[in-house]
Amino acid sequence: MKSTARLQIADVTVQFGVASEVAYDYLSDPGRRAEWQASLLRVADEADVGEPGEAGSSWIDVTAVPFVRPTMEVVESRRAQRWREIGRWGPVDAALTLDFEAQGKHSTLVRARAHLTVPLVVAPGLLGVRVLAPTALAADLRTAARLLENRQTTDPHQEAS
C-alpha cells in the first residue's frame, strides 16, 4: 500500500520583461531568493557545484515559518530552459520546476509548477495549501520580474549577477 501522496499545488505562468538568460540566472541563484520569495528570510549553508544554482548545489532555506528549515537541492539545471529543485523537511518533499520560454530578445514566460509529497494521512488536510500556493507563487514571481525589470531600466547592460 502506498504511504505517500504527491500533489500538484501550483501551476502558474508569469511574464518577465527580460531575456530568458537574465531571468534564469536570477531565479536559479539561491543567494538571491530572499529578494523575491516572501516566505524566505535567507539561505544558509549554501554549497554550490559550479555556478550558483547548478545541479547538485544545495542549501537550507530559513523560512518565515518557525522550525521549517528544508534542505534544498538543485536536481536539474539547463540555463534559460529549465531549473528544478527539491526541498526535504521531515517526511515532506517539495519540488519546484521553472520552465523558461523566450518570447523575444527581452521577454520571457516563466512557468512554475510546484508539487508536494506528503504522508498519505496528511494529504486530505492540504486543501488550504492547494488554494493559497498558486497565488503566493505567482506573487513571488511577479516580484522577481519587477525587480529584474527595474534593474534593466536603471542599467540596461546589467545582468542578474
Predicted regions and their residues:
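Hydrophobic ligand-binding cavity/cleft-lining segments
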Residues: 1-51, 161
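Short, surface-exposed coil-to-beta transition loops
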Residues: 9-11, 67-72, 92-97
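A generic beta-sheet turn/junction motif
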Residues: 16, 63-65, 78, 89-91, ...
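A short, structured loop/turn motif at beta-sheet edges
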Residues: 17-21, 75-80, 99-109
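Short, highly charged C-terminal tails/helix-capping segments
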Residues: 40-46, 142-161
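A short, glycine/Asx- and small/polar-enriched loop/turn
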Residues: 51-57
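Short beta-strand segments that buttress and anchor functional surface loops
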Residues: 57-64, 83-89
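Beta-strand/loop substructures that line and gate deep hydrophobic ligand-binding cavities in soluble
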Residues: 86-139, 155-157
